[in-house]
Regions:
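Extracellular glycan-interacting surfaces
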Residues: 1-156
């Protein structure tokens, strides 16, 4: 199953490799309108994460999780309200409970327990060169994370 954020206040799913798309019905459960980042949990395809915000670039942002492929949603507990829409979400295949989320304005959040609790990196984009893309070996400078194919390591 594929998931994609294609419009304001909705994400879509496809069961035929993208030939057709159906709305997941996020709009009836999530109050912040602009859906942006979508991520399926690496070890459990039932669990979907959604990053969104009030608009494409500004306002309040939020993170949500669905345990049932988008039928129901919960807002995740961030340590502070993001300074903009959550655009990027990433996980690590070796540790699917490790997630990164970044706002359009540079804040980076991390969880090691699949989203039950989050911390905010002290440094933001501009100081962190690579934050939410895992494709083999990556590293962040001046704080952030470093990983290869093993479980991720955080540096502050």
């Amino acid at each position: 199953m594929l998931f994609r954020s294609l419009s304001v206040r909705e994400i879509f799913s496809s069961t035929d490799n993208g030939a057709t798309w159906e709305p997941v019905q996020v709009r009836s459960q999530v109050s912040i309108p602009y859906c942006r980042g979508v991520l399926v949990k690496a070890d459990d395809p039932q669990v979907i994460y959604l990053g969104n915000g009030e608009s494409a670039f500004g306002g309040l942002g939020a993170l949500h999780r669905s345990p049932d492929r988008g039928q129901t949603w919960e807002t995740l507990p961030l340590p502070l309200a993001p300074n903009g829409t959550i655009w990027n979400l990433a996980t690590h295949a070796a540790d699917p409970d490790f997630l990164l989320a970044s706002s359009v304005n540079g804040e980076v959040f991390c969880t090691t327990d699949a989203g039950d609790s989050w911390s905010k990196f002290a440094r933001e984009f501009g100081e962190v060169l690579e934050s939410t893309r895992f494709r083999g070996a990556h590293q962040a400078f001046n704080g952030g994370c470093s990983d290869a194919q093993d479980a991720p390591t955080l540096f502050t």
